[in-house]
Each structure stands twice: as C-alpha cells, then as structure tokens.
Amino acid sequence: MKLIILTGLVLFAIVSFIEAEEETGRACILLYGECTKASGSCCSNLICDCYRKLKKGVQIARQCFCLEKDVVYKKHI
C-alpha cells in the first residue's frame, strides 16, 4: 500500500515539474514545429518563419513554423 502511494506521489511530482517547465517557457520548439503563438520560442539554431494563407487573394490565416536559419524554401510546381 505504501508503495502505491509513493509511486503516485512520484508520478504527480514528475507531471507537475513538466507542466511548470512548459509554463516558464524553457522548452524550445523544434524544427518544423508551429510557432504562430510563440514566435520567440524556437530553439537557438532556428527562426520562426511565417506564411500567409490566401484564398482567392484574401488572407484567411497566418501560420508560422520553426525553420533552419539561412535556408530558402521554394515551391516546386
């Protein structure tokens, strides 16, 4: 019984630590991760690059992703 309670407390502590770390913003967003709402949260070797989503010439959304610095992406038609 004590082992079950101890295990539960340890799991609770681990989950609480992970949630606290996410709230403080220590964790960075990895390559190709979305950074629309957190533009400064990409890892140090990445930049947050944003794109406008257009429908019939009208912007309907804006999406941002963490991409490699100094890399150019081109649309292949």
From Swiss-Prot:
Subcellular location, record wording: Secreted
One GO term describing the cellular component: extracellular region
Key words, A-Z: Disulfide bond, Secreted, Signal, Toxin
Expression (tissue specificity): Expressed by the venom gland.
Pfam families: Toxin_35
Domain of life: Eukaryota
Post-translational modification: Contains 4 disulfide bonds.
Principal cellular location given in the protein's record: secreted
Molecular function via GO: toxin activity
Propeptide: 21-26
Range of residues in the leader sequence: 1-20
Family as reported in the entry's similarity comment: Belongs to the neurotoxin 19 (CSTX) family. 10 (U11-Lctx) subfamily.
Protein name: U11-lycotoxin-Ls1a
Lineage: Eukaryota, Metazoa, Ecdysozoa, Arthropoda, Chelicerata
